[in-house]
Amino acid sequence: MNPKDLAPFLDLANHHANTTAADIEDICEKVKKYGFNAVFVNQYFVPFAKQKMGPTGKVGTVIAFPLGQDFLEIKIAASKAAAINGADELDVSLNVGLIKEGKWNESFEEMLNIVREVKAIGQKKIVKFILETGYLTDDEIKKTSVLILKSGADFVKTNSGMGPRGVIVRDVELVKEATEGKIKIKVAGGVDTYEEAMALINAGASRIGTSKAVEIITS
């Protein structure tokens, strides 16, 4: 696969606190120009990005990002608002504390509620749950991935890009092994080069979130 063929695998993201409308317009134009999968923006900019991307362009956003420890009611409300206002894909940060404490039922119920509410707005809305693998053991990664699969979500996402580390190939291998390849995998965090992207895709990733999408395909 040559660098330009990677474009459909890439989500071009801007989740900075100082992002402006001009920044969002810029990345929307790049998504359209290079054929990336979607533009990913903070919730506030979802309607603006949807307007810029047009009816066929895909817009994603993040929920409870990056800490994941919002009240469930807030996560649900934010997810619904994002979906109603034009988000096609939602990357939701899980409450890692629940995972570390072994509160599997509570974590699973959170997933189920969010998936149900988003899919009620539109069955084609894509829900991803973020593991934040840098905080988790191999067993925690695998067990949480199985719960994400069972919840009806569309993707396991490995990292936010704002945790203790970015994605590594081992993360993808663990998710794929645990779920027997039955759920798609999105990776993020430190994927800046064509070589890094290809290593992750070869391991089983089907989507990459990055702010360096243009650099990856033009390298």
Regions from the language model: what does each represent?
Residues 1-18, 25-31:
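Generic N-terminal amphipathic, Lys/Arg-enriched alpha-helix
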Residues 6-14, 39-41, 57-63, 90-92, ...:
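Hydrophobic faces of well-ordered beta-strands that scaffold small-molecule active sites
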Residues 79, 89-154:
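Conserved anion-binding
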Residues 50, 70-81, 136-148, 170, ...:
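Catalytic cores of alpha/beta
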Residues 28, 32-48, 65-67, 90-109, ...:
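Glycine-rich, proline-tolerant flexible connector loops at the mouths of alpha/beta enzymes
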Residues 50-54, 108, 112-122, 173-180, ...:
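Surface-exposed amphipathic alpha-helices with a cationic face
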